[in-house]
Structure formats: C-alpha cells, structure tokens
C-alpha cells in the first residue's frame, strides 16, 4: 500500500503552493525596501544606496547581515513576553492577509468563501501588535505612537470595510476568485470608482505609510511604537510594513483591476505587473505629499472618507435594486 495517495499528493501540492506564494511575498517586501530607497533617490535628484555591490544591488543583503548581528536588546522594566510577541503578531498577521489573494486561476494559499472578512480580521489583529509594542516597551513615545496607530487604524478600517461592501453587493460573494471572475468584461474600478478611491486611501492609512505615518513620526515621536526595538525584532516590524504594502496593492488589483486577467501574457505576469504598479504608487505618494497633522488625518477620515463610502454604498444598492426590477 503506497502512502502517496492522490489525496495526499493534492495536499502536498497545495502546501507547496502556499509556501512558494508566501516566500515570494516576503521576498518582494524585503526587496521593496531597497527599491523604495533607489526610487526616492531618483525622485529627489540624488543617488540613493549605491555602495554595496554593483549599483547598490547587494544593499539588502548588507542590511540583513547587519540586522541579524545587532544586539537583541530588551529594555529594563518592560514586559519581556509581550515585548517579544508584538513583532511576531505584526509580521504574521500581515503575511497571512495575503493568503486569500489569488495570483492566478489555480494559485492561491486559501480559497475562502469569506475571503474579504478574513482580510479584515487579520488587519484588525495587527492593531494588537502595535498596542502590545507600545505598552510593553515602557516608553512614553512608544505608548503615544501606539495610541495614535490604534486609533488611526481602527478608524480607517471602518472605511476599508465599507468601501468593499459595494463590490460584495455587486458581485454577490465574499470569495476573491468570484470577484476576479466577475471582472472578465468590465473591471470593478469603473462602477466602483469611489469605492476604489476610499479603499486606496484607507489602505495607505492602515499600513501607516506617508502621509498617514503619524504613529511613527520621527520629528514628533522619535519613531513611535518601535523606538525600543532592535535586531530581528525591529526587522519583523520593518519587513512587515512592506508586506502590508504588497498585500494592499494585491488586493486593489484583485478587487478593482481584474486580478490576474489580461490578454496575451500569462495570468501571473499580469497580476505581478499590476501589483508592482501600485507598489510604486505607494513610493510616489511618499515622495510627493507632505505629512498633515494627526487631527487633520482623523478629521479627513470621518468627514470625507466616511460620507463618500456611504454614498458609494447607497448608489450601488440603488443600481442593484433598479436592475432587479
């Protein structure tokens, strides 16, 4: 009797696909840190990292070696267990958020019927990591940064979820494959433009990226909630932020820009090209926009994004009811 039954082979193939996809996501997040510095140098008329390797190509390797050998320091009077757990939760929750994204018709870590709800759950779990880091560090700047981050993230997650409800109502499913298949003729960005706009803004805010990086503002909070972190613990926070950018970019592509669909090229290539475009847009936003005050960020969310999201949802519901008659 052979152990390698068809069912076992299918399970092994699924596990292999999941490992490959998640490793690619981590690699993309790591390489984006180097690409961002090079692009920012280009935008600001300077060189950027160009000393290690040809044209700075080994800068990422040098950063990893440096981070690996730095002292793994824990501050006095801190809660060691929670201090250590926070970066692990941050990294894991952001990485698992990508699990529901189909990169091709047959490649996805998990094909869940509640795919969008799973993403919102993982995004909410990342808030606990920020709170744990701020509280366990026993540092006033860390705590202030954590309070800012949690309030901002929870506020913009409201708009993040509501902006997706128009797509869900239009398609009639929370499943990501169903959403991609529904865009065979028309991308969702056309009927759901305001949903796309609010989702993109909320995605930048949830990732704590410029101009919504008040929780980590160096001029005000000396790097915010991860001021006390060093070594690999800081590395998990650092790479996790870029994994969040990759995940939000992939979700924008999947939900509003047809996912892996496109002519001539293989599906995975289309998905990668579209995702790379929005990753570059994250960097361009950082290079071109100033940082507003924290109260302006919160007011913009509740006074602009929320009404826009609700109007989009009401308009979508009205169109669906009209077409059903």
Swiss-Prot record:
Organism: Yersinia pseudotuberculosis serotype O:3 (strain YPIII)
Function field: NDH-1 shuttles electrons from NADH, via FMN and iron-sulfur (Fe-S) centers, to quinones in the respiratory chain. The immediate electron acceptor for the enzyme in this species is believed to be ubiquinone. Couples the redox reaction to proton translocation (for every two electrons transferred, four hydrogen ions are translocated across the cytoplasmic membrane), and thus conserves the redox energy in a proton gradient. This subunit may bind ubiquinone.
Reaction(s) this enzyme catalyzes, per UniProt: a quinone + NADH + 5 H(+)(in) = a quinol + NAD(+) + 4 H(+)(out)
EC nos: 7.1.1.-
Topology versus the membrane: Multi-pass membrane protein
Single Gene Ontology MF annotation: quinone binding
GO biological process, one term: aerobic respiration
One annotated Gene Ontology cellular component of this protein: plasma membrane
Binding partners and assembly: NDH-1 is composed of 13 different subunits. Subunits NuoA, H, J, K, L, M, N constitute the membrane sector of the complex.
Keywords assigned by UniProt, alphabetized: Cell inner membrane, Cell membrane, Membrane, NAD, Quinone, Translocase, Transmembrane, Transmembrane helix, Ubiquinone
The protein's name: NADH-quinone oxidoreductase subunit H
InterPro entries: NADH_UbQ_OxRdtase_su1/FPO (IPR001694), NADH_UbQ_OxRdtase_su1_CS (IPR018086)
Family to which the UniProt record says this protein belongs: Belongs to the complex I subunit 1 family.
